Amino acid sequence: MKTVLIQVGKTVNKHFIAGINDYVERINHYMPFEVVTIPELKNTKSLSEEQQKQTEGELILKQLQPSDTVVLLDEHGRQYRSIEFARWIENKQQTARRLVFVIGGPYGFSPAVYQRANEQLSLSLMTFSHQMIRLTFTEQIYRACTIIKGEPYHHE
């Protein structure tokens, strides 16, 4: 199974970039993992929040294949403890060809993206910046990989 993380806009904080790159490299020792960055919209002052979500949504949908299992990182999604998330990933490895996680733009997702999604996942009841969640989520994917393999990274 290939796992993909789609994100809207570049990560700009050099410390986050270094951390994300480190976890992506580690994850690739366990499974094929790729980060796809959709360019940030330009000249958004004349666009409403809904128009921005619509345009970003179209760009997100273009990245998806019909057979993809699509999971949105969304504040209203299901929450898992790390071990539960690892078991969820392990199950998806048996049933999905390509597992695609999506981190939306600053205003969230368009209705079309919600409609296409198979599931929604929330990492916390708290709100994080889109920049921060990229690092946090890649670490959680890595943590799940080590739990699945029984390696001593995660401590209960």
What do the predicted segments below correspond to?
Residues 32-33, 37-97:
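S-adenosyl-L-methionine/SAH cofactor-binding core of RNA-modifying enzymes
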Residues 15-17, 81-83, 110-113:
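Short glycine-/acidic-enriched loop or helix-start segments at secondary-structure transitions
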Residues 17, 21-24, 54-57, 111:
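Short, surface-exposed alpha-helical segments at coil->helix boundaries
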Residues 2-4, 34-36, 100:
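A structural signal for isolated positions on well-ordered beta-strands in alpha/beta enzyme cores
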Residues 11, 75-78, 105-108:
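Short glycine-rich anion-binding loops that position phosphate/pyrophosphate groups of nucleotides
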Residues 1-27:
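N-terminal beta1-alpha1 ligand-phosphate binding loop
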Residues 111-155:
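Structured adenosyl-cofactor binding patch, chiefly the S-adenosyl-L-methionine
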Residues 86-124:
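A mid-sequence interfacial segment
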